[in-house]
Amino acid sequence: MLLPKDPKKSAKKIQEKLKKKLNKDISIIISDSMTRPYRAGVINFALASFNLQSLEDLKGYKDIYGEPLKGTEVAFADELAAAAGLLMGQSNEMKPIVIIKGLNKKRHETNNNAFDLIIDKNEDLYR
């Protein structure tokens, strides 16, 4: 399956059409596989998303010992894409869509795209 030319627009368009057809407030993630520095194998990641808080900033929240977190940001859309990748497969499984139900996370209109996960070149440890 080929990726859309504009994944960001496509995620929004798919979400709007399915929301209208199903009458449900849903989120969309378009994913692809990638390699990672210092790790073997590929993993799914969120190429684009819509109606989903893609990055969850937990700075200031308490950890399991009651200590405040200082720099924890969760790549929430990537975590969902990786989980979906287990079901979609990476070769000839031909399962291009995974539905995740019962996820109790808030929808987010402003921080709603996986492009928000791209970090500045100056903060990137691998460039």
Q: Residue spans of the language-model regions?
A:
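Internal active-site segments that recognize and position negatively charged phosphoryl groups
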Residues: M1-F45
